């Protein structure tokens, strides 16, 4: 059995990323921009077959890298993305911390 190749690309509207494996859509993450310095990750979904292949984590990484490049902080409304932001310190630099 050949190794499957998963690729990640940004949606044409720039508001999310999708994952493809051999031409098949296997996952996506969506977000909205808030002002000039924040973005909200609102949804991450991965087909069941690919949930253990780190597709969701890699989609979160794609969004975080975009946030870094655009000098934005990320608010995680999606439970999966929030869990990844809590679990992996690599996201600390783009995590939005609300202060009063």
Label every PLM stretch briefly.
Residues 76-86, 90:
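Conserved beta-strand-loop-alpha-helix junction that forms the acyl-donor binding cleft
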Residues 64-79:
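Conserved GNAT acetyl-CoA-binding A-motif
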Residues 15-26:
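Conserved beta-hairpin
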Residues 10-17, 92:
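A short helix-loop-beta-strand connector motif used in the catalytic cores of GNAT acetyltransferases and
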Residues 24-32, 40:
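Conserved beta-strand in the GNAT
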Residues 44-51:
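A short, internal acetyl-CoA/4′-phosphopantetheine-binding micro-motif in the GNAT/acyltransferase core
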Residues 52-65:
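Conserved acetyl-CoA-binding loop-helix of GNAT-fold acetyltransferases
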């Amino acid at each position: 059995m050949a190794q499957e190749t998963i690729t990640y690309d940004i949606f044409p509207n720039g508001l999310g990323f999708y994952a493809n494996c051999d031409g098949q859509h296997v996952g996506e993450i969506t977000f909205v921009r808030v002002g000039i310095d924040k973005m909200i990750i609102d949804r991450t979904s991965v087909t069941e077959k690919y949930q253990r292949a780190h597709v969701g984590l890699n989609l979160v990484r794609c969004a975080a890298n975009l946030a870094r490049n655009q000098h934005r902080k990320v608010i995680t409304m999606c439970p999966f993305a929030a869990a990844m932001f809590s679990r992996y310190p690599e996201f600390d630099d783009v995590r939005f911390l609300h202060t009063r």
